[in-house]
Amino acid sequence: MSDEKISMTLNFPKHKRARRKKYQKEYQERHKEEMMQQLGRRFQNQPSTSSAPPDTVEKIPLPTESTSALPFGDSPRLTEKDYETNYMIDPPVVSTHSAELIKSNRVVIKAEEAEKYMMIKAKSTTSKILQDFQTKILETVKTKRRLQADVPYIIHPCHSMKGRKTPKQKGGDESFTASDVSDDSNDSQDEASTSEPTNRQAPEADKTGEVKDEKQTCNRRNQQRKAKRLRNFEEKERQITLLKKGIDRKKTHPNGIHPDISFNEKGLGNEGPECRCPEPIKTCGLKHGYYAGEDKAIDCKKSNGENLHYYTLRVTPLPSENQLYRTHMAINGEEFEFEGFSLITHAPLPDCMTRAPICKYSMDYEFQLVEEFMPDECFDPEDCDMLFEYIFHEIFEMLDFELRPKHIPSDVESCPMIHIMPRFVQTKDDLVQLWSSKTVLAYFTSKGSSEIMSPEDVNRLCDAQIDQFTRNTSKHKQSIVLNTKFKPSAIRADWFERDEEKKEVYVVHNAIRAQTYTAISLPRIAFLEKTLNKMIQEKQSSGVYNKDFEKTKNELEHLKRENRSARNLKLREPVAGFIETGLKPDVAAHVVMTILACHHIRYNFSLDVFEEVIEYKFNDRRVIELALMHSSFKSHYGTPIDHVKNMITNCGYRRKYGAEDKREKKRVAGIMSLFNIMKGTSGGEPILHNERLEYLGDAVVELIVSHHLYFMLTHHFEGGLATYRTALVQNRNLATLAKNCRIDEMLQYSHGADLINVAEFKHALANAFEAVMAAIYLDGGLAPCDVIFSKAMYGHQPVLKEKWDHINEHELKREDPQGDRDLSFITPTLSTFHALEERLGIQFNNIRLLAKAFTRRNIPNNDLTKGHNQRLEWLGDSVLQLIVSDFLYRRFPYHHEGHMSLLRTSLVSNQTQAVVCDDLGFTEFVIKAPYKTPELKLKDKADLVEAFIGALYVDRGIEHCRAFIRIVFCPRLKHFIESEKWNDAKSHLQQWCLAMRDPSSSEPDMPEYRVLGIEGPTNNRIFKIAVYYKGKRLASAAESNVHKAELRVAELALANLESMSFSKMKAKNNSWFQNMRRRLEQDTSD
């Protein structure tokens, strides 16, 4: 704001007509702003609030007589219709024991006859079968695997633990100051219409200096951007080079069965190393396989199955369902089918354990753990360990899947945390016959002792008739065959072919090339998709298709068809060296689900340790699992996901490329999606990370800290309390509390470069701590949160913990522990509040607290209220934040934290609280000062409401505050959502800039706010802010603080943008804004 305008606002002339003349121009500007806002309301389909302009000068309202209109108009008063919804009842977010394990009632016995039959077929006995399997099968395949060529890995640099921000250059300053920015020389005309007039009397030299400074600043920023782009380009080139080397290494591997078929290697994915973490952090964290609590050696080999717990892993739908080929074995006319795996643990699973992980994996199956009896003679730990190594490591090559606890040194003997046993069962008359582990060993021994076809069999089949060849090879069709000479060692044999001239029989495997191995056309496809999307956006903006649209679309479809056919691959390999495993493709899905279930079980055992640390037991672990899930975490199979994909592709049921279930892809970006989400008209999906809980936990932690500081530091003003609270709730302190609770050992996040940086990891820990506090709040209320925060903060300092936990009563309550309502009948000041209590339906035990809430700062200190209401207002703000956050979290389960923050801001804003103050008539009960006091401003009314909430919290507790806020505040949310008043000016401007962006631009231009100048003394600062879009100034404004100035300049810029947009769109019949308005009208009519 200029000096001339400041003087105008401070020196009011006495003559009434002179006042009208001086404020006539301001009224015209204000009316113009209202007209611009009407355009915005029309765009948002809001009812018009404008009135007819005055006919004469006398009808212009004086500034003191006109009400200060809110940016989007006053919210309407509540009616009975607004209370048709019960705001005190919430949908459940947690449920007690919702995941209780199922116990099977099946009668399970050992299949004795099957064991005798398999021992005869394997030419062994029950006492020798383990040794025979180890020597004939396991050692044979291992010896053959050792002959594979040892090709060194491509060395990738480790991720850096240092900050990613580049150091500032000498002489350069990244911050925006008044000397760094100045007025643009080419937009002075725009400024006259959209902002306050500039000081035209400034010296010409100053203007020249400002322009020169701005040019230097722009040049410096351009140089910094170029240097950053160059660094990013060089780093990208290095990564691409390493990626190509890694792919070429796999393609040219001497033992690769085919250059285009990917295979598994320990610690290596399809595109490079799975772990690029620095050495200091390789020995910790879930992503490296370190589970909390797995620090004790376990040996159950000599316990004869004592203290073991048996669970059957049921996979639904059954992988062999509706499949012609499945894993089974016929013995004496009885068919034993492969049912899956049994998981044997050394401790019972927690009662409150979730049935499945919270994260979603890209498999079409789900698993369920069923507690089921197993005969003692069916299970042997050593047998299961051998079977695990053979099935998971040698056949399916899940080389990074380990069940042995990593906290224990390698030279210490210990059992795996979970024993895995294959299940072959035959059900008859509700009686289940189960193969013992030794029967399974005999089965694999009999199958893998010799090759699929001997040389004599090959010669015979080459000379046989085609029908005989088909019959003899059909029994091996869709079998998983193994040859550890190759990579991958196990493939699915889709069918067999022969070459009569060469006397060879071939295994035929239909494969799908990995994306990283595929055609060269992928970059072209990506480019065409991007180009096509830009053309579609241009059509939405202009209503006219690009002339090259059809050509680009046809080329894209053609390349996609070629790429789809190029990914199909037929592999022919001679049968020599291949052995039959006795398994069919249905086992692949069971293997993946078993790996996932093992991680889930071990993680829940770790949560037992976490519950012991915080001394709290959750009723439902879904909420704590979600709290410990970082936003970077997608899915976890307990092993690298590339290994799982390769195994399913090579060994699972064949699925034609392109026939996968196509998920519906919805456009989630854009202004219309945001409006639809806030209205609840777009379908939502569960948000599978902890950011929603972190949003709620932030309010929980703030209230806990505010509560303790308020009652501990009784003589500190609100400014000092706010400083202490900021220090306690900052990320650095919360990250320390998270480590004290061992959250760093429980947090699930992606195995990449995101959280390698120490500062970023501490930030994630702080957010996780807040999410955990929210989870405890939802599960058990506010009291356990207070206890756990206290222990995390001062658990190792008993003296400080005692001081923190010792909460004194409020001084007014200490004076009258039984209540002071008797004083209200003899004190006129207190008796006036009976009417307010009757109006609200709330009766205070200590009515002096209620009087203190209505005692403003200008009231002298007295024995009745013992001070003013500023401390209560500070406490009430935290109470209001928590209760509103809790309401939004429960009522909007599909809203992201950003959406809920917008709604909360609209509910707890000063404007809303001022309306609440007027609706409840709080101003009538303000204790008057002995001298004349001015009328309450908007901020004063808001402080009055917060002080009342603080007094209610101190006197009656959190539940009374919850009832008051939900009844008084929450019904207004419907109005904010329907009228879209949650969208403040800065957010609205950003959405407009995104909507008006150039489709050909790689990155959308965002509005940029710059500080043009700071004027005035320290106690009366005036900040001048300008907003720029694509380098051009849209508006500038001056206010008493930066936040107000940015909001004001955003409003002015919106008015200018809307007028420009509508005048431009007037020349176009099918404009983007008309489409948006039509869509909004359709949504409203629907």
UniProtKB/Swiss-Prot annotation:
Q: Name the PROSITE patterns on file.
A: DS_RBD, RNASE_3_1, RNASE_3_2
**Top-level lineage group:** Eukaryota
- In this record, what's one Pfam family? Ribonucleas_3_3
Residues reported in the UniProt entry to bind Mg(2+) 2: E873, D943, E946
Ranges for the RNase III domain? 607-781, 833-957
Consequence of gene loss (knockout): Sterility.
Write out the biased-composition intervals (Basic and acidic residues): 24-35, 203-217
Bias type Acidic residues, positions:
181-190
- Bias type Polar residues, positions: 43-53, 191-201
Basic residues compositional bias, start-end: 13-23, 159-168
Q: Does the keyword Nuclease apply?
A: yes
Matching CDD domains: DSRM_RNAse_III_meta_like (cd19877), RIBOc (cd00593)
Q: Where in the cell is it found?
A: Nucleus
**Any single GO CC term annotated in Swiss-Prot or TrEMBL for this entry:** nucleus
HAMAP family listed in its UniProt record: RNase_III (MF_00104)
Q: What's the name of the protein? A: Ribonuclease 3
Q: Which organism is it from?
A: Caenorhabditis elegans
Q: Which gene encodes it?
A: drsh-1
